[in-house]
């Protein structure tokens, strides 16, 4: 069989790599893909943009049996609706269901309607009422641009001045284009974050392995937010008890609530959670797709065929399958271009990939391109060095062995990915 993966990031390289491992799969097309998917066994890039929906559907109709969507942008504009209208299997939520990620305001209102735990909040489109609300609530406080801002439209303001500047920026300056024309202001939640990703077939839910990502650009969680600088799986904060609470209080009410409201949810559903000291989960955000970089360590641990699981979802039979996981933890370190998440250079030649390929683990490509037979940088997050180990500390050590082999002009990475889990292993408890 043949499969199409839509996207060009590290997440899509990991999905394509995993799908290609199924012996029934002869070919994995990736649109538009990156240098990693260009050279991955069984994989081939297709030069179609992720938002060129008609072209994607035309290609899928002629060439593939099923499609898996990586990024949020095509989902929010209705790629699944179009594929379905043409009788094509496409794993992901419809445009209506993808509002869970496409609009922060839709999501907060949905959570309130269904009594799903989340931070207190209010939506604003005008500066004055927003500033008055800030005065009333004080800092720390969280300001979010309403639409898609590539994971960067969230400001955790530790002072009122910072909060007011963020509101002015998003509403008056419209720093995030269209996405910022409405803001959500919400209470600051204390605790530990976890990424809880499940597969949904409309009615049944199959949990994936838990993970924790590191959003801040600098060590010890300093500096601005990014799309994610590294991740590991599983997330020890999600104990068996917390897992049950998340399913009962967050995932099931969300899937049922969406169905009741006429937006039956299919695809990957990612709940970004804050877990407090008592183990109570609150929803920070939903994403309507697998996380990036969480996909990379999670796929490394998945022993089952991803294709089989997706087929079960199309058959509305996710309750009949189980996902098998390697019990060992895995950890991925993102290698980024100098200047990220701000402005960065593209087109630098990447050195050391051949040496890294000889070391245990896997270097997934994100912002890379093939130019004259050389792999060059083509984005802010460029690679993700991913490895497993008997402990998180071992997995971390192995991932950094990989990361150290690879470099280009201005490359950098965080040196402490997984620090919370490693502190737990050593018996130091950190919040």
Swiss-Prot record:
EC number(s) per entry: 6.3.4.13
GO biological process, alphabetically ordered: 'de novo' IMP biosynthetic process; purine nucleobase biosynthetic process
EC main group: ligase
UniProt GO molecular function: ATP binding; metal ion binding; phosphoribosylamine-glycine ligase activity
Annotated residues for binding of Mg(2+): 285, 287
Keyword terms of this UniProt record: ATP-binding, Ligase, Magnesium, Manganese, Metal-binding, Nucleotide-binding, Purine biosynthesis
Catalyses which reaction(s): 5-phospho-beta-D-ribosylamine + glycine + ATP = N(1)-(5-phospho-beta-D-ribosyl)glycinamide + ADP + phosphate + H(+)
ATP-grasp domain ranges (all copies): 108-315
Transmembrane segments: none
Functional pathway: Purine metabolism; IMP biosynthesis via de novo pathway; N(1)-(5-phospho-D-ribosyl)glycinamide from 5-phospho-alpha-D-ribose 1-diphosphate: step 2/2
Binding locations of ATP: 134-195
A Pfam family assignment: GARS_C
Domain of life: Bacteria
CC cofactor: Mg(2+); Mn(2+)
Cofactor note text: Binds 1 Mg(2+) or Mn(2+) ion per subunit.
Family matches, as NCBIfam families: purD (TIGR00877)
Family statement drawn from the similarity comment of this UniProt entry: Belongs to the GARS family.
Name used for this protein in its record: Phosphoribosylamine--glycine ligase
